[in-house]
């Protein structure tokens, strides 16, 4: 027997090629192919329980025409039907009156409770719930007919008009033959993951009932109940709340209370496992014990609480009801364990010593070999196209910028061509062989400082720079291979967030400083001209037959102006423009002759436009404008669109803006040298041994730079599935140091900001999410193809000069500023710096401030600021040769902080070092589990201790 409307639904689903038997699997598209665990990250309930869609159908129209109308729905948050406006409200946290919960408990205690009901359709279910002694056969028949009526759903697609409203007629508003195909194509259904189930709550006033009628049913197997719910899902729960007319919104609030109860994951967990009425009431009592009561007069009950940015962890809630249901219990957890709930305290397998020579390298190779085929197949996704375009432009800009700086620092021994070629060769080789192919190799500020010092040393002592540099690179490769052989990479366990944030902040400030500095240099090259200033003038000189530039050499003057010109010999540019001066045989002289005063202003305009536009588009993903698909595209291609906008404005203005300069010929920058560097040149042989001393300092710098970046990229919160490769990465860097030294190319190491930008452009997020729930972070699209494509395009860029020459340099400087600001603003260190400037009453409610006194937080931040300032000063002075030692000194400073801060304070301010982690259980630092209001961990996600604090949002 088919229920009313079931045939229409089957026909509609057949049009979509959706088998009715697959309705219990959610959307026909099935699970997201990007990650089979798409729904696993949702906070809808314990992992073994499917998410539940709940709908409240209210009986309206008594005593005239009775009809069921959908008035509310729940997935994670509540959506109310705005009847007058004809639309759904924004998702919000549901609020209930305490009497409604108490009345609901009384009704359930006296009503009908059916657990594991064997009903297979709506008709059988209705027959079960109406078998009560208080109903006569006539009333039972009327009630069954009423319960079998098709409810009026409010289905509204994006961009369509409301299904009903105050200006529409009742007949049009309540079309009982709504097409079921619209139900199959419901946008809400697309937001529900596979395996989702439904629950229906029916409530209302019924005049022929003398006393309330309550029934709660849990079906043994999820069953499709026809058009009872707007989303065609198999139903698991059914709740009926009917009774005689009463004042107020009694039954409406009772229905909301039942739906809110079922939407609670803990109550739902208990009800799914309840065996009798006592278990059901016990779960309800446990819910009541957790309810927070707001005093009347201090809060507007009609106000809607927006969904929080992040939901509290389920294990933070008291396990009372789990202990009472079937004797189950939840293990006791301390705050120290919760502090590390997203990552184990024990070191990862990549950071455990094997005790064998090159043992860590061998393990990295074995671990990565099994993932190698998927490193290419996982790149077959449109998101990778956006990542390639963005990182390519950022890499090319970085290579050209550092190539120019390197050319200035080495007097042309290396230049832009070597920078582009070296970036392409080293980057592509690293992507093919490395353990973490998401890393972007590039010239970095610290390495550039070392190159400048090394060249100055060779110049002062009349040494051949490139041969001496070759031996430095050889020794660096030897030292790095020794570090790989002895498994020195396990020492990165001592690189805590204190060290990571100091290094990341330094690199970010270098990006910001270089971007602003380039704009100031551009303003100096194209100065702002003010009328009346000396630099504003331009004079035209005319040479005479004897070299006297004051003589007029053209035919005899015929006008008063000509006579004045003959007497002066100099014509002001306002009377004779430079191009006319040349046509007349003169020479324009003066600083203002070839200066366009608008370039500086419009360069600043393009600089700020690209910077602000990239930020605005990146934040578009979380805005309220446009559909989610459009927002995601705009956010993914934010930097590309910002660059295109800058190019469009430049073409529209038509000014001679400085453009991106790419070498047109494939030959070394230094004339007369080949691609292979001679081993000695004019240097004595013993310099090959003496080069070991500067190589030792450079090895420390390379190790710190490479491994700090690797630690940041491989943090637990990024959910990388394929593991890290600390030993293999350092091995590849050592080989590339040898290769680039032999070819006379720049040295390359992991670029922190570019690597994090690469990872952020490959973020994977869940597709199915409840209304009001933000997309959950699923991880990073780990593959090798995007990096390989980026560096291949970088090498081809040498031949793409006709295309790249249209990109204005101020636009690229704006993108550089964007990358630096985004990197700097995303680390917790900057959040704590902001706290130093806020009065205590205006500070956000952070987890950090709940466990650590504010004065201690400020002291920790001040120490970090002092270390950062010292690093910057050393980098900018001739003492920069000891810069690698200062980076290593950050670890020593962090170790010394154990004498200033307690382990519990360091647990929240930073991370514990390996020795401290072993001592945490012994010291008993953390108190027992507390469930007071002050410990409700509801702060923003960015302040969660193990959240991705260093998360560059630059794509």
Curated annotation (Swiss-Prot):
It holds the Pfam family Band_3_cyto. Residues 20-50, 154-190, 331-352, 918-955 are annotated as: Disordered. GO terms for cellular component: apical plasma membrane; basolateral plasma membrane; lateral plasma membrane. It is a multi-pass membrane protein. Keywords: Anion exchange, Antiport, Cell membrane, Glycoprotein, Ion transport, Membrane, Transmembrane, Transmembrane helix, Transport. It is found in: Lateral cell membrane; Apical cell membrane; Basolateral cell membrane. Highly expressed in kidney. Expressed in the outer medulla and the inner medulla in the kidney cortex. Only expressed in beta-intercalated cells. Residues 387-955 are annotated as: Membrane (anion exchange). GO terms for molecular function: chloride:bicarbonate antiporter activity; sodium:bicarbonate symporter activity. GO terms for biological process: regulation of intracellular pH; sodium ion transmembrane transport. Glycans are attached at residues 548, 572, 951. Disulfide bonds: none annotated. The keyword Transport applies. It catalyses: 2 hydrogencarbonate(out) + chloride(in) + Na(+)(out) = 2 hydrogencarbonate(in) + chloride(out) + Na(+)(in); K(+)(in) + 2 hydrogencarbonate(in) + chloride(out) = K(+)(out) + 2 hydrogencarbonate(out) + chloride(in); Li(+)(in) + 2 hydrogencarbonate(in) + chloride(out) = Li(+)(out) + 2 hydrogencarbonate(out) + chloride(in); Rb(+)(in) + 2 hydrogencarbonate(in) + chloride(out) = Rb(+)(out) + 2 hydrogencarbonate(out) + chloride(in). The chain crosses the membrane at residues 387-407, 415-435, 472-492, 503-523, 596-616, 637-657, 684-704, 730-750, 785-804, 811-830, 871-891. InterPro entries: Band3_cytoplasmic_dom (IPR013769), HCO3_transpt-like_TM_dom (IPR011531), HCO3_transpt_euk (IPR003020), Na/HCO3_transpt (IPR003024), PTrfase/Anion_transptr (IPR016152). Electroneutral Cl(-)/HCO3(-) antiporter that favors chloride ion entry and efflux of hydrogencarbonate and sodium ion across the basolateral membrane and may participat in salivary secretion. Also mediates Cl(-)/HCO3(-) exchange activity in the presence of K(+) as well as Cs(+), Li(+), and Rb(+). Does not contribute to Cl(-)/HCO3(-) exchanger in the apical membrane of the upper villous epithelium. PANTHER family: ANION EXCHANGE PROTEIN, ANION EXCHANGE PROTEIN 4. Belongs to the anion exchanger (TC 2.A.31) family. This is Anion exchange protein 4.
């Amino acid at each position: 027997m088919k229920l009313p409307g079931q045939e229409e639904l089957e026909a509609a689903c057949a049009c979509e090629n959706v088998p009715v038997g697959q309705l219990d699997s959610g959307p026909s598209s099935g699970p997201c192919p990007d990650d089979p665990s798409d729904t696993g990250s949702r906070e809808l309930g314990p992992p073994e329980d499917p998410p539940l869609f709940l709908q409240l159908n209210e009986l309206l129209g008594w005593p005239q025409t009775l009809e069921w109308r959908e008035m509310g729905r729940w997935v994670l948050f509540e959506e109310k039907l705005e009847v007058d406006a004809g639309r759904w409200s924004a998702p919000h946290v549901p609020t209930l009156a305490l009497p409604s919960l108490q009345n609901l408990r009384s009704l359930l205690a006296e009503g009908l409770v059916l657990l594991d009901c064997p009903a297979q359709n709506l008709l059988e279910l209705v027959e079960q719930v109406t078998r009560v002694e208080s109903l006569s056969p006539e009333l039972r028949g009327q009630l069954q007919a009423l319960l079998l009526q098709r409810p009026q759903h409010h289905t509204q697609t994006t961009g369509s008009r409301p299904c009903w409203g105050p200006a529409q007629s009742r007949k049009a508003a309540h079309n009982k033959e709504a097409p079921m195909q619209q139900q199959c194509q419901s946008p809400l259904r697309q937001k529900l993951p596979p395996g989702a189930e439904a629950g229906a709550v029916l409530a209302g006033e019924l005049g022929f009932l003398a006393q309330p009628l309550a029934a709660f049913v849990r079906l043994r197997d999820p069953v499709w109940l026809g058009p009872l719910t707007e989303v065609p899902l198999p139903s698991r729960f059914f709740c009926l709340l009917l009774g005689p007319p009463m004042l107020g919104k009694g039954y409406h609030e009772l229905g909301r209370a039942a739906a809110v109860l079922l939407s609670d994951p803990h109550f739902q967990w208990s009800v799914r496992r309840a065996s009798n009425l006592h278990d059901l009431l016990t779960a309800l009592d446990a819910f009541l014990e957790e309810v927070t009561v707001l005093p009347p007069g201090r809060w507007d009950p009609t106000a809607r609480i927006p969904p929080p940015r992040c939901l509290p962890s389920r294990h933070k809630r008291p396990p009372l009801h789990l202990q009472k249901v079937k004797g189950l219990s939840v293990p006791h957890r301390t705050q120290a364990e919760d502090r590390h709930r997203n990552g184990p305290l024990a070191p990862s397998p990549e950071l455990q010593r094997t005790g064998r020579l090159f043992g860590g390298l061998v393990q990295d190779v074995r671990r990565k070999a099994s993932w190698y085929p998927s490193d290419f197949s996982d790149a077959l996704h449109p998101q990778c196209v956006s990542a390639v375009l963005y990182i390519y432009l950022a890499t090319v800009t970085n290579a050209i910028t550092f190539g120019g700086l390197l050319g200035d620092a080495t007097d042309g021994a290396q230049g832009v061509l070597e920078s582009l070629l070296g970036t392409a060769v080293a980057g592509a080789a690293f992507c093919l062989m490395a353990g973490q192919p998401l890393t972007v190799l590039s010239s970095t500020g610290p390495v550039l400082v070392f190159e400048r010092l090394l060249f100055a040393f060779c110049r002062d002592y009349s040494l051949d720079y490139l041969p001496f540099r070759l031996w430095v690179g050889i020794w660096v490769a030897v030292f790095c291979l020794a570090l790989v052989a002895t498994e020195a990479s396990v020492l990165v366990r001592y690189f805590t967030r204190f060290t990571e944030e100091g290094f990341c902040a330094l690199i970010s400030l270098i990006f910001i400083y270089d971007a602003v500095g380039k704009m100031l240099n551009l303003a100096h090259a194209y100065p702002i001209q003010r009328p009346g200033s000396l630099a504003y003038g331009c004079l035209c000189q005319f040479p005479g037959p004897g070299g006297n530039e004051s003589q007029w050499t053209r035919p005899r003057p015929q006008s008063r102006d000509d006579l004045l010109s003959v007497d002066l010999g100099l014509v002001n540019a306002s009377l004779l423009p430079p191009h006319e001066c040349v046509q007349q045989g003169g020479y324009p002289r003066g600083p203002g002759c070839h200066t366009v005063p608008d370039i500086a202003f419009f360069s600043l305009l393009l600089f700020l436009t690209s910077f602000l536009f990239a930020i605005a588009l990146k934040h578009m993903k979380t805005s309220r404008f446009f559909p989610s698909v459009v927002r995601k595209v705009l956010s993914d291609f934010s930097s590309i669109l910002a660059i295109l906008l800058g190019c469009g404005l430049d073409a529209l203005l038509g000014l001679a803006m400085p453009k991106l300069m790419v070498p047109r010929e494939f030959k070394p920058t230094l004339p007369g040298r080949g691609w292979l560097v001679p081993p000695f040149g004019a240097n004595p042989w013993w310099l090959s041994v003496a080069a070991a001393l500067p190589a030792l300092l450079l090895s420390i710098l390379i190790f710190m730079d490479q491994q700090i970046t690797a630690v940041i990229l491989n943090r637990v919160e990024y959910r990388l599935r394929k593991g890290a490769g600390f030993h293999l990465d350092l091995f590849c860097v050592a080989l590339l140091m040898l290769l680039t030294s032999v070819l006379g190319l720049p040295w390359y190491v992991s670029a922190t900001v570019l690597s994090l930008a690469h990872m952020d452009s490959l973020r994977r997020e869940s597709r199915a999410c409840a209304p009001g729930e933000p997309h959950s972070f699923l991880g990073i699209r780990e593959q090798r193809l995007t990096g390989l494509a980026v560096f291949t395009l970088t090498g081809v860029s040498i031949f793409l000069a006709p295309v790249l020459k249209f990109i204005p340099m101020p636009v690229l400087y704006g993108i550089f500023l964007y990358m630096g600001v985004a990197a700097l603003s995303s680390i917790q260190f900057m959040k704590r710096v902001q706290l130093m400037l806020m009065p205590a009453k205006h500070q956000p409610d952070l987890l950090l401030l709940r466990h650590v006194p504010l004065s201690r937080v400020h002291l920790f931040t001040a120490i970090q600021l002092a270390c950062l300032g010292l690093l910057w000063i050393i980098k900018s002075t001739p003492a920069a040769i000891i810069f690698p030692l200062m980076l290593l000194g950050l670890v020593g400073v962090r170790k010394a902080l154990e004498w200033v801060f307690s382990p519990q304070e360091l647990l929240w301010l930073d991370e514990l070092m390996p020795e401290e982690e072993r001592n945490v259980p012994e010291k008993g630092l953390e108190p027992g589990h507390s469930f007071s209001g002050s410990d409700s961990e509801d702060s923003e996600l960015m302040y969660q201790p193990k959240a991705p604090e260093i998360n560059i949002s630059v794509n």
